[in-house]
């Protein structure tokens, strides 16, 4: 089973980075105030929000946004046959529906490939497709962007502890980008995952590290 193989692989590789989430949460207000980084959630907050979902279609939609960085229009257009889950390194093929700059010769932008490394998400996808008998060319989430926004709003309204920032489906995309930066993902890789034509669009997310330079100042003698 691919999901089991991923679990074993993640356990065998020492790829965890120790991140102080409370400190980053404390810094977020200043980061959002003084930089161009769009509003984002930190990993523990994303987990809290996703765990609050009771409907499996909303749960999977949020997980898909979080794990792939897809725009909501791209996410709700995804059919099962865009996911390749029965391989050693699962991935999803996402058709970029928004791009800036001069279009490439030939017109339509080629789909981008985004790896899926989380075994539990792979299992969730497999289970959802099987349980709901979603045909390979049908959309996983046959809803509109407006409906997706409303479902997320209703979920947040029911939460006892509400997030401290305004959340839309696009927030998951920003949150993945910030999370990838915190975990040391190379910018060209992140650019590819997000489908940015111009890497300067990706560079914006590095500003989340603005307050992570304290240790460099400590080296200086005054």
What is each model feature region?
Residues 134-138, 150-192:
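Short, basic (Lys/Arg/His-rich) helix/loop patches that form interaction surfaces
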Residues 52, 64-65, 179-180, 193, ...:
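Short alpha-helical segment immediately N-terminal to, or the first helix within
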């Amino acid at each position: 089973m691919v999901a089991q193989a991923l679990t074993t692989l993640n356990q065998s590789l020492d790829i965890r980075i120790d991140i102080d989430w409370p400190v980053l949460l404390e810094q977020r207000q200043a980061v959002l105030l003084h930089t161009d980084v769009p509003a984002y959630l930190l990993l523990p907050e994303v987990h809290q929000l996703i765990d609050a979902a009771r409907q499996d279609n909303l749960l999977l939609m949020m997980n898909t946004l979080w794990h792939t960085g897809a725009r909501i229009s791209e996410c709700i257009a995804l059919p099962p046959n865009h996911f390749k889950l029965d391989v050693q390194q699962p991935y999803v093929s996402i058709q970029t529906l928004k791009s800036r700059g001069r279009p490439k010769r030939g017109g339509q932008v080629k789909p981008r490939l985004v790896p899926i490394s989380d075994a539990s998400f792979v299992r969730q996808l497999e289970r959802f497709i099987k349980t709901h008998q979603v045909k390979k060319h049908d959309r996983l989430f046959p809803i509109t962007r407006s409906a997706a926004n409303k479902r997320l709003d209703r979920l947040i309204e029911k939460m006892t502890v509400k997030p401290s920032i305004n959340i839309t489906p696009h927030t998951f995309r920003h949150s993945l980008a910030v999370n990838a930066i915190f975990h040391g993902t190379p910018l060209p890789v992140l650019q590819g995952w997000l489908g940015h034509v111009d890497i300067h669009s990706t560079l914006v997310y590095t500003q989340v590290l603005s307050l992570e330079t304290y240790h460099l100042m400590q080296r200086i003698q005054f």
